[in-house]
Amino acid sequence: MNNPRYLLDTNICIAYKKRKPGIPERIDSLATGEAAMSVVTWGELVLGAEKSQQRDKSFAILKRVREIIPVLGIDDAVGDHYGAIRGELEKAGKPIGPNDLWIAAHARAQEASLVTNNTREFERVAGLALEDWTS
């Protein structure tokens, strides 16, 4: 798979899963390979399904989501970006959450726009392109 144009944050994948207005249409209109999710996002989605009162239904929905939105693994380049971003944010005294840090590093390493409705958190990361499809 070539680098995706968009890396979808957990909140956007949840909005897709829940069929929130505008999100499914936007994702479904993309060409194959234009959007993906980080394995970190996938882990957060699996955790949500594990904790769900409707576990089996949640996992069935996640299976369908994964068929549409591929999951990208982490490689050395992501680790390089993670270290650089974390160092920059710690020096500035503006850290972000650990999973968000990995997701930001993954998007930046892929040269993909991170699609999130949590732009306030991610705008601290230099060189990270952001899009909010919920507004």
Give, region by region, the residue ranges found by the protein language model.
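Alpha-helix capping/helix-boundary segments
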Residues: I12-C13, T41, V78, W102-I103, ...
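Short, well-structured N-terminal submotif of metal-dependent ribonuclease cores
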Residues: M1-S38, L47-R64, K91
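Residues at the C-termini of beta-strands that transition into short coil/loop
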Residues: V39-V40, D75, T134
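Nucleotide phosphate-binding site architecture
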Residues: C13-I14, P24, G43-V46, L72, ...
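Generic structural signal for small/hydrophobic residues in well-ordered secondary structure
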Residues: D9-T10, L45, Y82, A107, ...
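Active-site neighborhoods of divalent-metal-dependent phosphate/nucleic-acid chemistry enzymes
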Residues: N2-P4, I69-V115
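Short, C-terminally biased terminal segments at protein or domain edges
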Residues: M1-P4, R120, L130-S135
